[in-house]
Amino acid sequence: MGFDDDDEDLVVYGTPIEREEDTSARKRRAVAEAGQLRALPAWKQEVRDEEGRRRFHGAFTGGFSAGYYNTVGTKEGWTPQTFTSSRKNRAEMKKQSIYSFLDEEDIKDMGGNALETSQQYDTFGFTATEHARKQASKEQKERPSAIPGPIPDELVVPATTSIGVKLLMKMGWRQGRSIRDAHADSLYESRREARKAFLALSGTKTGGQKIQVDSHKSDKDDGATESFEELHASGNTPVYVLHPKQDLHGLGFDPFKHAPEFKDRKRLQKSARDRNRSDVSMRGSLLISNSGQYAPGFGIGALEELGVEDEDIYASGFAYEQMEVDIEPSKTASDSNYKLEDRKRGVFLAFKIASSSEYKLERFDPPEIPSDFDGRHKFLTPRQDVNNLSDLAPPEVPAPEDTSLRLLIEGCAAMVARCGKHIEDFYKEKSKTNTQFNFLNEGDGCSYYARKLWEYQQKYIDQQKPDTVQSKSSDKLTAENRGKILGERPLDRSTKSSSSSFPAKEAIQLQSNLADNFVKPISLDGLPEYEKPFRNDPAKQARFEQFLKDKYQGGLRPANLIPTSTMSDVDRARERLDFEAAAETIEKGKEKKAMDPLSLLGLSGINEQRFVSSTESERSIPARDEKSIYPRREEFEWRPSPILCKRFDIVDPFMGKPFHVQRPRSKMDSLIFMSESTTRTNEVESSSIAPQHTSVAGATETEAKGAATDPEIESSSVQRPVDLYKAIFSDDSDDDMAEPLANQPVDPVKTSEDANMVLNRLVAEDFLESLGKELGLDVPPEKPTPPNVLFRSETPSTANAIGISRNRKAITCQEIKENESALDKEEIANASADVPSDNVEELGLKYEKQEHRAEKSRSRSSHRQTQSGSLDSDSTSDQHRSRERRSRHKIRSGTPGSDSSIEHHRSKKRKSHSKHRTRRSRSPYADSSDSQYTKRKHREKRHHRTRNPDTDSSDHEYEERHKSSSRRSSDKDRSRRRSRHHKR
């Protein structure tokens, strides 16, 4: 297909459109019906192939489809043939073939795959292969070729010869000939000829004539069949086929191909061995046939073999002259002679043995095994490998006479053996300038240096070996070996064995030896004063120290060093438990090297409370013990906080049960989680609180002492963790509670119970209040406190409980002072109503001085709080915010009582203000500043708002008290006016 020059650069994309005349009519019809077929419903559409023919499903004997959809033309589709059979018309057996399920195209495709015989399976080549070979040879003769002669069969005929044909051809078979043994025919012919000769010699004349006639006839018959046998018998059978393969050479290999003389020699030797073997085995009996004789009249060539046809099988009689048997010598005797000496003739025909041989047989003795030889191989370590592969030990050489040279050689050898070869190289470099080291360069003392170097190297290797030698697998691991492996130090035992029948002196000596072997622990060298928990009871303290000795000190000891016969078993067991607890506390106190004085003070307080009660306040702080102890496992009871149980809406499992004082587990635990009673006692003792009713001078002294001890108090006060819920929901009246006195006894069990009760009541009130606010309900008013009831009249247990609840908010000593000063002011304000008019001015002056002192103390405390840490400031700010929130709520809720009581309070405040105003105008010492009046007014309001939540008093009683107080105030005013009028 050619293109023009202009169209050479064009590229054709896509499939070219066929011409209409090239397509068949069926294809044109399929293209035309393609658009119509898409518009038909699914069940009417027919599947067609690329030629436009309907697709044929080859699943049945007929039909294009096998179902309802896309059927041949009926709704049912293909219908199978009905089975009919009768007597006249029997049902025929239909034989199905593969052509019943194929269409025309499939049959056309399979038409060329018929089964036929091929030349590949023509095993014997009688027909196809032979014909092809002959045809190829004829064609080769007719046409000229560059290769002269016939073409080999491997180039013309394909390789269709099977392996069986190849093997037969190797064995002597040829194409077109029968497979039979030609040697059997020759054997038969030889026997027949021998029979003829025997009859001719032993028969009569007539018989001989008949035999000649018969032989003549038989010769004719043989001549007739000879030509046939020559045609069908093998005439060119190889020699190696007659002789079976009995050597180790390859198939068809002849080692004597180019040396026929060696081949003849070998054949003669083999025939001689066979003859000797047959003579020994067959000539011993008289009844056996004379098979070893040869038939007379037959000559044997020099190079011919003695075959079966040469035997005289028809000979009669026995060979008596050959009865002597030559017995071959034994094999052992023949083996003793040398083979070369036994052969007088040459081994081969063309060789001769020399008269004198230079060959001498030499025998070598086996090597001698040394006595220290071990058949098992021992693998050496890298260091041993290097040392053992070195040269052997040098011989011993006497030391040089020069002492300085000998010392120098020994020192140099020791240094080289320890440090390595580089030290020797360094000394060799030094020998170039210093003649003393000439022994390193084959000088005087070289042999002695080599010997000493080897000795030091061996000594160094021996030192590097481990001390413990591995025992054999059969040895058992004893206690001593185990102790050595683990690095344990054995106890020093005395030479004499211990026995119960020792005299007294030997027993004392044994005990002293044991006491010297055991070292006393550091804790027993002398207990410090603060680590003697039973020092108030000397007998018990002595028993405790003996308990520590028995626990930590070994050796022999008497059964009862301290008599305890007066104690019962229960008391003795309880005392032992106390001793163990005390010893454990002392050990825990020695975990760290240093401990600050406050932690030692708290630890001593805990020990005193746990074992023996004591009122001593000053503790001696000894030096810290540096004994290291191992960690111990402890079990303690964890109790959830009541507020935690409330938040999770569960019942407190420990409700009403006293708190158990836990042992401090570390230094921080002893600081923070110290017993409340001990902390409160220390605070009370160090705060130096002034009494309730003090004079102006006494108050001044108390203020000076408090200012002097402020730094110490701040250093000893520890901020406990702030509970957020308690800081928010605790009552504001807790800040106004007073601490119990220092001289009152404290019961820790009762204190914990009261603290739980107060805390639960406060939490419940706060919860109800918050719930009422959320539901939009009014909060019920709290019951007021009588005006003549003071907080100092509370019981010690209640005060302790309130103190514990306040301690949970980390109250410092400065806050305690402020609360007490506020209480003093409230007492003065309450007592001013009952004071006569003559002492009003004195009380006012006293009140103003206390106010001034409280203001100064508050300013100092605020200044210290600004300098304190972030944690304290945050906790204090949270407390102030919670107090302001509660105060605002109380102002909104108002004072419980009727509206008349509120008006009564207001009138009372106005009267008190007018009274103070009058007193200020008459007092020469009064301060006329408005700020003091404002502060006093707020303080009085706080006093009126303060009430005790635990007091049970009805509203009626509250109103009556206020009415009586108002009547008393009116009477006092009238009496005061009378006195003024009288003075005038």
Curated annotation (Swiss-Prot):
It is found in: Nucleus. GO terms for molecular function: pre-miRNA binding; primary miRNA binding; RNA binding. GO terms for cellular component: nucleus. Residues 679-695 have a biased composition (Polar residues). Keywords: Coiled coil, Growth regulation, mRNA processing, Nucleus, RNA-binding, RNA-mediated gene silencing. SURP motif repeats lie at residues 408-450. Its main location: nucleus. Residues 160-202 form the G-patch domain. Residues 814-859 form a coiled coil. Residues 130-144, 473-495, 843-858, 947-974 have a biased composition (Basic and acidic residues). It holds the Pfam family Surp. GO terms for biological process: miRNA processing; mRNA processing; phloem or xylem histogenesis; siRNA processing. Residues 882-892, 905-922, 934-946, 975-984 have a biased composition (Basic residues). SUPFAM superfamilies: Surp module (SWAP domain). Residues 697-709 have a biased composition (Low complexity). Residues 130-153, 464-503, 679-717, 775-806, 820-984 are annotated as: Disordered. InterPro entries: DUF1604 (IPR011666), G_patch_dom (IPR000467), Surp (IPR000061), SWAP/Surp_sf (IPR035967). Functions as a component of microRNA (miRNA) and small interfering RNA (siRNA) biogenesis. May assist Dicer-like (DCL) proteins to efficiently process and/or recruit the precursors of miRNAs and siRNAs. This is G patch domain-containing protein TGH homolog. It comes from Oryza sativa subsp. japonica (Rice).
